[in-house]
A protein has these predicted regions:
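Signature of exported/secreted
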Residues: 20-348
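Bacterial Sec-dependent signal peptides at the C-terminal "C-region" and cleavage site
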Residues: 7, 13-25
Length: 348
């Protein structure tokens, strides 16, 4: 090769490397023996913003149907707190192979525009769970650390191991400005910390299939999750309390339309008399916008904090016509609801 061209090629390669910039690894890399205290707080404000009920072409007031209802009171709030102490006994293949988790706090509280309020703590508070990775089952085995504790396994068997936000990490090394996405059940797991979404959906689907209403909840939940996507962007580093933390910006703006007509019609057909005919339309339109950021401690290999807000709007348009033995009737419901959610998480 001509020496001049060789030098030009090397110079071009060096320029390309400089243009691409250095790559950083945002990865879970906690050392064995590490203990982390983690806190997750979720608050939601919900409201029913509009409701129209019609029957045989006439708009109805819910109060006229005997319902004690005022749209101004159709709102409420919900709060959820989970705090744990995680002890990492063994790490393998980028995840805990053995983890001891003490549940310090697991409680929820609510209030409504009707004046109702309350709170409840889980029986698992104060207990320690042991997660052990089972390679053959490709899943974690969960058990109580104390065999003397009489707690129903239902209280903890759906508690997810991943409270490290690992699902939010990029698959490869990244440069500042690089983006990636998470969606579906991974995103649902971020919104509901501590819940094993796959197990919860499987359990709900099994319960529904054993009941009188043959609704495929798994199909429904996957349809809802399909359009939910978060975009994550690596925004470089930031000095916080003498630590250099990696900044991951969180964003998302998505819409989803669901036509549940066939699913609901199938569910109610078994309850209808043979001579009845039903024409049904149920459409749900959803839109959401998310913003926030996660700070990742690259040196320690775990998240330091996450703050995220999400605004969610849902519009339901349900209409039906029934002809039962020559007696025809029609009705419909139009409703619009909204929710503002705030999620905060810390690990130290």
């Amino acid at each position: 090769m001509n020496t001049r061209f060789a030098f030009l090629g090397l110079a071009a390669a060096a320029g390309l490397v400089a243009f691409v910039g250095p790559k950083d690894e945002v990865r879970f890399a906690v050392s064995e023996g590490t203990t982390l205290t983690k806190s997750f707080e979720t608050s939601m404000e919900m409201s029913l913003d509009d409701l129209i009920i019609s029957f045989n072409g006439q708009e109805l007031d819910p109060a006229a149907m005997g319902a004690d209802f005022d749209l101004a009171d159709a709102n409420g709030s919900f709060g959820y707190v989970l705090s744990v102490v995680d002890e990492y006994g063994k790490i393998a293949d980028g995840k805990p192979a053995m983890l001891r988790r003490t549940i310090d706090t697991l409680m929820g509280e609510y209030s409504s525009g009707m004046g109702d309020s309350g709170s409840e703590s889980a029986p698992i508070e104060g207990e320690t769970l042991v997660y052990t990775w089972d390679a053959e089952e490709d899943a974690y085995a969960i058990k109580l650390d104390s065999e003397d504790t009489a707690i129903d396994p239902e209280e903890y068997e759906m508690m997810a191991e991943d409270l490290d936000l690992r699902s939010m990490l990029p698959k490869d090394s990244v440069s500042e400005g690089d983006s990636w996405t998470i969606g579906g059940r991974d995103m649902m797991g971020v919104l509901v910390p501590g819940l094993d979404v796959n197990k919860a959906i499987d359990a709900a689907n099994e319960e529904a299939s054993n009941g009188d209403v043959p609704i495929e909840l798994e199909e429904f939940m996957d349809s809802v999750a399909e359009g939910m996507v978060l975009e994550l962007t690596y925004a470089g580093t930031r000095e916080v309390d003498s630590r250099s933390l990696m900044v991951i910006e969180i964003g998302g703006d998505f819409e989803q339309n669901l036509d549940l007509s066939d699913m609901i019609l199938e569910a109610i057909s078994a309850e209808m008399p043979p001579e009845a005919s039903v024409d049904l339309s149920v459409v749900i339109e959803m839109a959401a916008e998310a913003t926030g950021e996660m700070l990742w401690d690259g040196k320690a290999g775990h998240f330091a904090s996450m703050d995220m807000e999400m605004d969610f709007v849902m519009v339901i348009d349900a209409r039906g016509d029934v002809d039962a033995g020559g007696q025809a009737m029609d009705g419909g419901i139009e409703a619009e609801a909204s929710m503002h959610m705030v999620r905060k998480a810390t690990a130290e």
